[in-house]
Amino acid sequence: MAAAAAMTAAGCGGAGAARSLSRFRGCLAGALLGDCVGAVYEARDTVDLTSVLRQVQDLEPDPGSPGSARTEALCYTDDTAMARALVQSLLAKEAFDEVDMAHRFAQEYKKDPDRGYGAGVITVFRKHLSPRCRDVFEPARAQFNGKGSYGNGGAMRVAGISLAYSSVQDVQKFARLSAQLTHASSLGYNGAILQALAVHLALQGESSSEHFLEQLLGHMEELESDAQSVLDARELGMEERPYSSRLKKIGELLEQDSVTREEVVSELGNGIAAFESVPTAIYCFLRCMEPDPEIPSTFNSLQRTLVYSISLGGDTDTIATMAGAIAGAYYGMEQVPESWQQSCEGYEETDVLAQSLHRVFQKSL
């Protein structure tokens, strides 16, 4: 597959100008779809592509019928619950406010705890709910004997930061801070920054996958050169700049004519660690810009991205929600099938949040 696959305006399916309303709506809709459909397969080591295709095709109503074929909505997980809480905080404060965001995360968990939250983050939220909590970043710093978490929880929810802030500097700053509320390891918050940057670039409409990767690599090589990032990677016995090395691997995989799912998982991962899932989501987006002989040609690029990302197995809901956010930001709402969207729990509120973000944060641009 050519590394410089075309990413032209025509390929965006009418998404419009950079940071258009269609892109905002597509971003959050794509993220919701990835979470809801991906949750069906979460934690399976292997996922049969035929099963995923059957699952999404069952969302389609009979020809001429509106809406979804499902009688019960596909439920979202903690991925969407936290992504929505993040957006709601940004809208309420019209800026990043760490105290408000931490409070909303914790209250969302308290209100609806059965969404699949991990044990570690539950401990953080319980501390946030305590009246004795004076520093909202301290509970995350105390995790894992003071080393902090390097899971993908900061990355899975971060898309709203990319929608709210238009400069690379702000995207990096607030992606880091929003992630550090629960993930204090640089291997965790750097993953959130990478995901936020990928959504940011997708919102602009880039010219090629090669350029897309080059920009991400430039940012991550700089970010991962700081002393804390080097130390955290070394303590885990990893290579220096683990995200940068995986971005380079993505470029190599895209150059190959044929890559099996097993190879992708072996090289990039499909786990709950941020470095085993964020690069994978980016690869899914870039790979699926071109047709896949195993996926029906009637599927558009966003649909292809979602199906392919879920077929990799592992942490399917989170990898698919991240890939869906990137693809939705790039291709826009025009590539979100109505029947798929309406199959998801909370799809109407998600769309309202996207429109509100665009109205509030685009007014000064």
UniProtKB/Swiss-Prot annotation:
Subcellular location: Nucleus; Cytoplasm; Chromosome; Mitochondrion matrix
Binding locations of Mg(2+) 1: T77, D78, D79, D317
Control of this protein's activity: The protein undergoes a dramatic conformational switch from closed to open states upon substrate-binding, which enables specific substrate recognition for the 1''-O-linkage. The glutamate flap (Glu-42) blocks substrate entrance to Mg(2+) in the unliganded closed state. In presence of substrate, Glu-42 is ejected from the active site: this closed-to-open transition significantly widens the substrate-binding channel and precisely positions the scissile 1''-O-linkage for cleavage while securing tightly 2'- and 3'-hydroxyls of ADP-ribose.
Residues binding substrate: D78, K147, G148, S149, Y150, G151, N152, G153, H183, L236, I272
Mitochondrion keyword on record: yes
GO CC aspect terms: mitochondrial matrix; mitochondrion; nucleus; site of DNA damage
Gene Ontology BP annotations: DNA repair; negative regulation of necroptotic process; peptidyl-serine ADP-deribosylation
EC number(s) per entry: 3.5.1.-, 3.2.1.143, 3.2.2.-
Alphabetical list of SUPFAM superfamilies matching this protein: ADP-ribosylglycohydrolase
Any one Gene Ontology molecular-function term assigned to this protein's record: ADP-ribosylserine hydrolase activity
Catalysed reaction equations from the record: [(1''->2')-ADP-alpha-D-ribose](n) + H2O = [(1''->2')-ADP-alpha-D-ribose](n-1) + ADP-D-ribose; 1''-O-acetyl-ADP-alpha-D-ribose + H2O = ADP-D-ribose + acetate + H(+); O-(ADP-D-ribosyl)-L-seryl-[protein] + H2O = ADP-D-ribose + L-seryl-[protein]; alpha-NAD(+) + H2O = ADP-D-ribose + nicotinamide + H(+)
Pfam families for the chain: ADP_ribosyl_GH (PF03747)
UniProt keyword annotations, A-Z: Chromosome, Cytoplasm, DNA damage, DNA repair, Hydrolase, Magnesium, Metal-binding, Mitochondrion, Nucleus
Cofactor binding annotation: Binds 2 magnesium ions per subunit.
Site residues, Glutamate flap: E42
Cofactor(s) this protein cannot do without: Mg(2+)
Assembly, per entry: Monomer.
Main function: ADP-ribosylhydrolase that preferentially hydrolyzes the scissile alpha-O-linkage attached to the anomeric C1'' position of ADP-ribose and acts on different substrates, such as proteins ADP-ribosylated on serine and threonine, free poly(ADP-ribose) and O-acetyl-ADP-D-ribose. Specifically acts as a serine mono-ADP-ribosylhydrolase by mediating the removal of mono-ADP-ribose attached to serine residues on proteins, thereby playing a key role in DNA damage response. Serine ADP-ribosylation of proteins constitutes the primary form of ADP-ribosylation of proteins in response to DNA damage.
Family according to the record: Belongs to the ADP-ribosylglycohydrolase family.
Annotated protein name in UniProt: ADP-ribosylhydrolase ARH3
Lineage: Eukaryota, Metazoa, Chordata, Craniata, Vertebrata
Gene: ADPRS
